[in-house]
Amino acid sequence: MCQKYDTLSGDRDVEHDEHFVLEDYDSESEDQNISSKSLGHSSELSMSTLALLERFKKQYSAPTEEEETVGDDEPKIFYCSRTHSQLAQFASELRRVEMPPSLPKELSEKLTDSEALEERVKHLSLGSRKNLCINPRVMKLENATAINERCMDLQQPGMAVEHRCPYLPSKDDEPQVLQFRDHTLATVKDIEDMGKLGKHIGVCPYYASRSVIKHSEIVTLPYPLLLQRSAREALGLSIKNHIVIIDEAHNLMDAISNIHSVTITLSQLQTAIFQLTTYARKFKTRLKGKNRTYIAQVIRLVSSVADHLRSIQGSNQPPDGAVKTSDLMAGKGVDQINPYKLSHYLQESKLARKVDGYVEYSKDTANRQSHGKPSTPVLFHVQSFLLPLMNPSAEGRLFYMKDQNDIQLKYLLLDPTNHFREIVEDARAVILAGGTMSPMSDYMNHLFPYVPASRLDTFSYGHVIPPENLVAHTLAQGVMGCAFDFTYESRDSEKMIIDLGRTVATLCQAIPDGVVAFFPSYDYLSRILHIWKKPLGADKNQTILGLIERKKPILYESRDMTTKSDDILQEYTRTIDSGSGALLLSVIGGKLSEGINFSDRLGRGVLIIGLPFPNIRSAVWQAKLQYVEQKAYSGSSGSETDRQMIAKAAGRDFYENACMRAVNQCIGRAIRHRNDYAAIVMIDRRYDKPNIQGKLPAWIKQSMVRSPTQRPAGATVQNLIKFFAARGSLD
């Protein structure tokens, strides 16, 4: 664990092996404060970590009391969103803000225009190493985990000077760090600007930005850096008594769950076993203390998990299901393992770094020179799964999912409440914001159940457009009179799907320019296209797809991850600009359902086909609903019957909310500015139900037009023609 190897060297000298050997692990004191998470006690830190801290202590002089307190008492705004592109858009808007002068009014009035100082908000963009690293040798790794680990490697005390990161700020670089701080605060910069500034000055923007935090007024950062305690600690980020604003908050609960969930495959486990075994054999005579014992325990534990997955894979069990922790840890000798000690060892010994480093170093020279894309260090991934496995949470569950050639094991966080609670309790105020946050009940029930109602305020504002710029229709029947029922039991009706195609063709004739149709899933879109491509009757050249294409050219959103959303959008835009209009077939929850703006001619019509209810038969959703119902039952009072009814209602509400949040996101892709206008058509008889309509945003409900029971499709089409004619969109 002491000196780190030089992974960039091509030498294969035996001497290099010593750099991969774990330092003697002292377990005598591991029982002391083993559950403590504080880094303030040196007894909990490994020797190399202490050496690293000592080196940094020497590099940086202790700040004066004045320096330490500058900006600490001033309230800051931490603005958080899902992607860096959304944060860059916020930074762009922030540049337009004119701040009032901080000089007293009587002094500022005496200044001439030429003397007046233009003041900007002090803004800082924070990002991960992957977004801010400027070291070419590290940037080329591309994978976030590999970048993080290589960065840490280059800081190890034993790293040769010529191979250390030249951009890591030290005591001698203090002028550059101050220059970086001053330039950062001088103007509003997005994450790309921060990288460019770091390159220009020659200092790492990831580390240099830490010194800017306490001098900032607004700090922007992506979800993972705020929602993960370890990320906040790594950045030295405290939100105590500050204001937290979370944009795109409809994603918040899923984001918290995803950050604290881990998925691993059987093939990754098998690779980890092979690598650990190879490492243990290679260094068996040089591993001292408890290292050999703990490595053997890790191998036994990983083997036990892999064996159980293999037994599931070879059985007739369903494609997915719940897994008990006890079953995963039922292997030979695993019951003798102390999970708390082993968890502590994995975090302190840096075993994953040593093993993954040795594997990387030991690759065949030809492979290392082939410039292939590096993969995620597999043992780090396995370790991230083992930690929650050995420290199970009441809010977490384990599931397996069979693939064609592999099987996955997933640890899923079911309840985000406690992980978000520490943010809520530290911050002066927490603001959740979003364009389409309806329905709202989930935020109250699953993010703030412990907060008194008197401390919670909700605000809902109308859309920027006047109501007459939007028309929203529900459509329960097609042009051929077939009822639109896209429930699981009825959705494969060929007759209904054909009528859907004819109805879409008719709607495309009534709606000008671009129309975006959203389907519940990629699989169902494929099913529909299969039927639409079939010949109609005796004429083998006539198909439903051809009928639609005579109205508008059709483009598809592909499930293929190699197909970029930007490429689809560019082709879609070019087709519309040619004057022919276009129909874009997309998927709810897909690449084009969020974060993409179909403004003006790109989105004159939005069609929502069916309701994207999650698969209630899946093990994951059964566990989610069971957890929500049990939580509601435990928190209720009254008779047993009343409590059971409350529990069932809570589960049903949670299930419907998940569906309608996705629908509302798709609807929100159109209507992007005050002069925009569009038509929304929701195609399914269930959209007429009050409980479903009640979960639509208020600005949609006020423009809702319910079609008549007789010939509803014809009435809808006529209404759309009038709507667009009134806006001069039709010839």
UniProtKB/Swiss-Prot annotation:
Provenance organism: Aspergillus clavatus (strain ATCC 1007 / CBS 513.65 / DSM 816 / NCTC 3887 / NRRL 1 / QM 1276 / 107)
Family according to the record: Belongs to the DEAD box helicase family. DEAH subfamily. DDX11/CHL1 sub-subfamily.
EC id: 5.6.2.3
Record region (Disordered): 1-42
Basic and acidic residues bias spans: 9-22
Main localization (coarse): nucleus
Role, per record: ATP-dependent DNA helicase important for chromosome transmission and normal cell cycle progression in G(2)/M. May have a role in changing DNA topology to allow the loading of proteins involved in maintaining sister chromatid cohesion in the vicinity of the centromeres. Has a specific role in chromosome segregation during meiosis II.
Lineage: Eukaryota, Fungi, Dikarya, Ascomycota, Pezizomycotina
Name of a matching Pfam family: DEAD_2
Protein name as it appears in the record: ATP-dependent DNA helicase chl1
